[in-house]
């Protein structure tokens, strides 16, 4: 009966492993679309004049890339193809990563919301100044004097002078109104132009937001799967009676998830390098060199050999020593049998 169960488990698990190639291809296709969108968006912003919006977008991308870069270096130091990964430390690291990435995601959302506020505030301030100018009017104070003939004659003279002044003022006001109408028409044109520019900017901003949030979803799903597989492998390793084939299978899934993360950061790194190169180029040669840079991007995109070489270079030489220290501490804290645990890893 046990043999039948073991063969059925082996059959079902081997079927899942056979689908790994299809899953890997679908993952590469999904990330290629996301990265290509980001690549095009950053090239568009480089062709436009530098402003606060472009600076915030570049800062946001740098923050995202820096997070992935810092995250992968300790993860890959825990895994080697020839030995069991340091599952316990890897599990703790994924737990921390999910928490900090959630905070980071909220910070990115706030930054993207504030991209266009600067230009809108300036336009509102200019409109307020024009309104204040239109509301300003000259006021006249009438001096009240004792009623006598002289004062009455003086008042009449003053009234006549004021009437003339009022007539002149009315003429000036009419002229000013005509000028104000022209200015208002010009302001309306400018406002319409800024609204059109804001619509274009909003569309560009929404596309970039979609790219970032797709990356967030992709990253969190990979880290969640990685954490779940680490937990399962820890449970399988502690219970010696469990099937050794399952431990190998979960170990395989963990390496797969780490490989997914490597592919993702490899593409982000490539975008980052190309973005820096594009900033250094002259405006006249931007179009030609953009095509060349995109060609190199497409050539390197599916080059798994280079990715594996990069992975091997990241692996820590002192992996075995750190592995033994962490697991020995874990075994002592939980009063586990050291010999049985080591035998299970060697099997």
From Swiss-Prot:
Keywords: Coiled coil
Domain of life of the organism encoding this protein: Eukaryota
Coiled-coil stretches noted in the UniProt entry, renumbered to this chain: 148-201, 261-298
Compositional bias ranges of the Acidic residues kind: 168-178
The UniProt record lists the keyword Coiled coil: yes
Positions of the UniProt region annotated as Disordered: 151-203
Ranges annotated as biased composition (Basic and acidic residues): 155-167, 179-191
Listed name of the protein: Putative uncharacterized protein DDB_G0279685
Organism, scientific name: Dictyostelium discoideum
